[in-house]
Amino acid sequence: NVHLGSFYHLAFAKKVGETFEESEHHALDRVLMFQGMEGYDDIRPGLTKVAEWDREPQRGSERASGDGGEPRADSENEATFDDFEIETADYGMNFESEDLHVDDIAADSASITEAVVAGERDDQFADAIALNAALRIYAREDVTSIDAGLTAAREAIDDGSAAAVLDDLRAF
């Protein structure tokens, strides 16, 4: 019951949340959208703006290191909308877009991801994959902060459970 996506203007991200709030056909409780480089729906090197919509107000998430203001809602019973920024350097990830360049996005990204979840790579790609996994873990509310999501993502890579999930998806 979580939607992940991307947005170009913050007003659009808010409109997406409002649309799900009014929808009679989609029972989503949470929307996380990213404004990264070139509209990617993931965290890219540098600064990424994140928009967060929750159907249930005041969930009490801490986000990135408990980093900020209160979610905005018009009344106690209405959904909340908030936005915040993620800077990859704040997570000890000092790399540029060029460091993540690949020639064939689909093929290279797949093989790199396989190597990372198999524990065969520990480089900028591994950091980028772990941070993006952290946001997805946070979006599902398995953790209350992005920092905790990053710890969980790295543990899943280290203990092999990330590779097991990838294997299960392949078998599906």
Annotate each predicted stretch with a short phrase.
Residues 1-145, 152-172:
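Glycine-rich anion-binding loops and their surrounding alpha/beta cores
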